[in-house]
Structure formats: C-alpha cells, structure tokens
Amino acid sequence: MRYLLILSMLGLSIFLSACGSSANSTGAKEAVEDYVNALASNDEASLSALSCADWETSALTELDSLQAVTATLDGFSCQQSGTDGETALVNCEGKMILSYNDEDQELDLSTRTYRVVEQNGNWLVCGVQ
C-alpha cells in the first residue's frame, strides 16, 4: 500500500511538472509574439510593458528606427527553442515587411533568438542574440 502511494505521488509530480513546462513555454512564446506585433504596429506602450527593465531602452530604440516605415508581418510564428538558466529562448519564423515610399524591404525574423524571463508572473522580452 505504501509503495502504491509513493508511486502515485511520483506520477502526479511528473504530470504536474510537464504541465508547468508547457504553460511556461506558451507564456514565453506569446510574449515574443506580442512583442514583435507591438513593434510592427508601433505600439510603444505595449512594447514597454512586454520588455524587462534592462531591455526597455533597447526596445524603444528599435521602435524609433521603425517610425518612418509601415511594417507588416508575413508568415509570422514563434516557438520556444530552449532555455539558458532562468531564461527562455524563443525563435520565430516569417518576415517583417517594411514599406517606405512604395518600396519594400524584408527582415528575416528567424535570424534572432529572443531572451525571455518571467518576472512577477509575466513573461518579458529581455534581449536578443
């Protein structure tokens, strides 16, 4: 009986750990998707809210560089690719199309890996590599 109880508790803890990892992976992925969408739509308030304090200035500088263009996303999706200690690593696919004076330039979104951290229950972008 005691052996069965220990096995049940072990199974439950593994199940709950797997559920927690899935939720964390989704949270980091969604944070990056929201962050890139905020960049594309020139949404400064959302971009600030989705950035950790150490990254916010860099995020706003990147947003400033997009002020003269119209940005749209094409084939955009993200997924968590791994972790680095407490940091989730998220990669995206697709491209950001930047339009200026009827000319388009494409930015390949797969060239960046976003560093995402959880702070106070919120996933925040905290750098790129």
Model-derived features: where do they sit?
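Positively charged n-region of N-terminal signal peptides that target proteins for export
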Residues: 1-8
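C-terminal motif of bacterial Sec signal peptides marking the signal peptidase cleavage site
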Residues: 15-18
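Bacterial signal peptide processing site
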Residues: 20-23
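Soluble non-cytosolic domains of exported or imported proteins
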Residues: 26-30, 41, 53-54, 106-107
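Hydrophobic pocket/interface hotspot
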Residues: 35, 46-47, 116
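Short solvent-exposed beta->alpha transition segments
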Residues: 41-89, 93
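Exposed beta-sheet edge and beta->alpha loop/turn motif
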Residues: 85-129
